[in-house]
């Protein structure tokens, strides 16, 4: 319908004020349900409203303003207007407006003739509130001469389009997009505006700017930027085509935004940059023409720059990363510095491909980011960099060439196809290059290292020496060697299956670089695959321009005036001769000078050949002058360099004043002021001339060392020696000397005992002031001491003084002169001195020399121990036991064992069986190790070989272990470097070999353990250790037992047979300790053991390969609560000898009772195994249905099993006859923002929470983004995009969490919506999805228009236009059905949600993964849901029935019901709940064995059958109604009467019966019924008549009477708000009555049949008010007939009390309150619950729809108001609007922010309201009431 404004009085004469007339036309169109308001050609003058937010004209829903054309119809502000106008035409503030707009006219702000700020167009909802304007269209609109903004759609608008419009000569921006969602600016022009042409701000997203033009603006042509620091940045914005030129600042500026694409635009002639990316992420600049910018100064055409807001409002630093520039044609102006430039401010990860750049002045490209790249070739895909987090990441590349950065954490990186660069970063990483020529880059030595106690070594799994490379160029190693002096050693593990590249030199933290490679690469490393130093970039003798890359390189300029730029990486720049300009770029660079002529100056001749360093970074870069002989900074003389600042303060010179024969002196300069910043640490100086020996005299000398390695000899006298830097040797000589080593590894040498001694009367003890036990040594090798001891017998006693400030090494044996050797050390070194830092003499100690006999009878323990102690005292050695049997006894304490080995001592015999150490007969003590290391001491470099330990178990009674070593469990320390070879341990009652807790680098090889009472071999917390070529047999428990945090452990070619437990077990040691991890089991055999061949229990990252496992009692291999286990290329056969088991069993472990955890077995990889079953073997490979999942089975050969080759229950487990294409079949994200990339295999990618990016790569993949706003790319192959919950992808009125599918192929890809309940395509309502596109047709949306309780509407987006292409072939709405027939069927589901229909027959249904529905149908069926939330549905009684008379049992059996997840659907059968099995209920019955629960009815059908099914397990006390889907009980739940005299009869169900007014007869029937009375007039009497209701069957045992809405307080005498209980004389009727009447003479009375004199307050509900509470959103709460309390909470709520005396409290937000019938209270608990701010325009005033004077109350007691008045001093004013339709209660004072309390009452209450209608803070009544006919003028808000 059209509404011509001239019909409403508008003149359009350019003089008259037409505001009212045009607004009247708008209002009329709105009242008619919508229409077009037409303005014929003319000039229509308009004025503003009372407030800025009123604008001039307010447009409303479904109304469009249309003119005769731009310039023909003009709406113009009146002259002289002085008040701000936030939108000449606008939508109403605080109201959601939709389907409106404007076209074919001009808005003129008349800025020259008024003084106020006036904006042109404005629309939008309240910032931060839940709401939005929608579907707004502006076409062919001109906005000009505004003093403010032109087009200003503002905050929370969805689907706005502005096209073919113009903004010019406005005071601020031409076009603004402020929080626009799904909008379009198309074919618009913005010119000559004072600020920006286009300004996109404040969370705007999913927004398109197409073919717009901006020129001649005072700011930038187009800006996309953050609006406020606490709001999300704009994102997902496409700028396509158009032109941005001749603007004063940038053509396009992208500032603090992300995911923006700028393409196909022309950008030229702008004052600053053509394009500036400023603190933005993931921006694409594609195929643009950018030229002739930088008109106002020297700038790059394209600048990439980070934004430092740390001192600003947010406190954040916004790094520009992930910028992609491709296919742009860039040409510079005379001022343009670079074509593309990164600032050196953290900007990084820029990717430049195939850009054409010319005409720039300084260089085409300048990149500083260490990970930024440039190529002249087109890219192979956008994702050039995959970056992890600080956590443990799994990153997988695609078929492209990628850079994969793990960063911190223990990461798994897989390059996939392509020539990739993998950089694990910090943490213990696993690196797999995949196909292609890959580079494994190490950027810092600490990225891959080990210490003495832990390994953080990276593992390369698939190094190809013929094409892959290891880049070590950033680490400073010089090549391969012995691991010292900057070289790397190449070693292999004992089995030759792993190669190590390692340095033996530690840093200050004890870290030594090491990497590991799977496989043997000895002899295969060369310059082609190990990059120690990047190939040099060399110049010529001419003037060269050399540029590095992002690697560490050496740039050699040679002769000429060269320009060298290192780029990223740690570079070395050598300018050579000539005057060179040196720029290091990013990284730690070295500027090296190899000759004086490299940088020199002749002040006499005026010849300046000094080099110039542009960007020297203090603390990172260095200047190397070591080749020139300069030794330090100084005055520039005598081999020193002076630092001199020029007079301008902008250049620093480093120079020598010493000239050569030609008059030249060395000099270089640095750009900038480095005074006070340069120190010796910024230089590499020459080592001062070496002084090999600094010798003193016989006097008291003070000797000072230098930075070299020196020998300081004090000779006689009391000397003071200080070694300085370097590894020095200090020998004080005679007398009392003070020795200070200084930095470096120093040796304190004592050449004679008399060099340092004391007597009884005097001390001549030398003092060492700074001994470092980690690197320094004390050399006593020439003094004859044998080691540590008690100070006697050639030993030294270690003693610390009482204060703990000084340590002494002393002999207590004096020489002939009474002198006892002694030295002192400053500090407490107890426990820190050992053979590693105190040098004694070592040798071989024969036990027989110490009294051992070896005769098989004598106790040789003391003699052997004496030999051990002597070897230790001598600094280490070998204790040799010749052939014989050496009996030993225990020492008494179990922890002392029999023999105690010590540092540096090895126990060696004549051979196994030749030398036997045997426990004496009759020993009854517990012995924790016949041979062991000391408890609580760190012992290193010790072991045992070529002998037998015999525990003599038949002739002893204590628990005896053979070998034991280790440190205190849980403490910081470890035994180290332990070796046992050719040792037999037998006949122990306990363990054989038991290396225990915290041992590093232990090797046991070629040894045997047999006939022991527990395990043969134990590995308990071993690190970097090996068991090799050992045999364990006939032990009572396990052959090998690996426990307690053991990691980096190898078991190679071991054999275990005939043991009473398993052959090999790897398992957790205790619930509070880390699990064993990173263990390789390679080769060997495990057979004929009583339990499993190999058991892996509560462990992770284990590989079992190349072994033969057979003849064992249980499974060959059992995985029990493990993660990431590989079982590869084994022979597993003929196991399950003792019981029916699978050959390979995968099972989860329920440890809730101990640790509280459930350990699911996941990530198992089984490939290439040959498996053959025995007569008992059930399956070749079986998963238990207990949460075990993500198993991947490839190319295994299985035969001879009895039940089936494979049984998998995991929803994500897979099996294939083909070899696997990679280990990772499932990629799973975290709760953060993840980037997951698939490979060429078929994979499932699970994003989980967070805003994830999933890329399937090749293969037929399943992508499930999970919660968050995800970007899904299927890649090659037929991919499925799965949505598991509606909240995985949705939008609300104000925010979008919509997932985006970037590459949907309707011919092969599918979208799986089967779990969401949608029925198909449609209009978006009634369970259908609507297909729409964005305005440009470049994006398709699948959306529901129906919101859930939280306001969420399901929606997904697809890049591209798929209208007409989406159908049943690519959209999965319904779960697929798997159907049987009338026979006995076995139906197996898959990992998706399905319906399994068995139909008739005795069927077996297994849902496997997914949320399945299982319907067995007729017959006795077995139902297994599998993983997921499954529903077991029964459609007929005959689906599961039993006849107890005939014995026919057709009951179904459910094997795996999961309480809290699965459901039992009996709704079709009419059962209404759990009960006694009668009257439509079901009863739960447990069988006598307690292992099966029956769900049954006791009511037989006509054929004698009753419904019954069973569940495996005991569910008594676990199953409740919530686990069932029951039928709705028959009959109404609420029986509601009318106003007449009703007769209401209940049923057997529980009902609420409300007769309402009238004299009603009420009967509840069976069940627990409630008789409700909401108002006094529901049941009452007067003096002359009775209208009392009668309850005929009140059951005091279960019924109740609800009086909560009437205000009675309890039973009493009928007065004071109580009710009297009275029985008539015949005892046939009981009355509840009040004797207090209301004004109409009505008093409550109720009759009940029978004598109910026993009624008490337990049968009556007096004040049990139900609370209905909303949330923080916009809630609608509706009460019933009872008295309720309705709490809205935050948000704009709608509260309706219904019947009853209700309390309504809207809370914060603009609420609508309706009490309904009854006496209601409208309560306000905070002044901001209902307020208005006339300054800001905020209107949050609550409205009461049905206030009733004399019945309802308004409760203001919490706010402090004392009465009615003028609105000041604690009173409220009553104000009536002009129309007399609304009454306001107002506080005219307000708070400090200008917020004024205000309530609106619908209707005219001005003459009725008085103090009796309120609950004030005090009882003060108002003395006067001010009634104002119209609203007074308020202060005007500033918008």
Swiss-Prot record:
Gene designation per UniProt: algE3
Note in the entry: Each enzyme of this family of C5 epimerases introduces its own characteristic sequence distribution of G-blocks in their substrates, explaining the extensive sequence variability of alginates. These alginates of varying composition have different physical properties and are necessary at different stages of the bacterium life cycle.
Compositionally skewed regions (Polar residues) per UniProt: 372-386, 1215-1236
GO molecular function term, any single one: calcium ion binding
Family designation: Belongs to the D-mannuronate C5-epimerase family.
Cofactor(s) required, per the database record: Ca(2+)
Ranges for the Hemolysin-type calcium-binding repeats: 387-399, 406-422, 424-440, 538-550, 557-573, 574-591, 695-709, 714-730, 732-748, 1229-1243, 1247-1263, 1265-1281, 1398-1414, 1415-1432, 1536-1552, 1554-1571, 1670-1681, 1688-1704, 1706-1722
Pfam assignment, any one: Beta_helix
Notes on how activity is controlled: Inhibited by zinc.
EC number: 5.1.3.37
Described function: Converts beta-D-mannuronic acid (M) to alpha-L-guluronic acid (G), producing a polymer with gel-forming capacity, required for the formation of the cyst coat.
PROSITE patterns referenced in this protein's UniProt entry, alphabetically: HEMOLYSIN_CALCIUM
Identification of the protein by name: Mannuronan C5-epimerase AlgE3
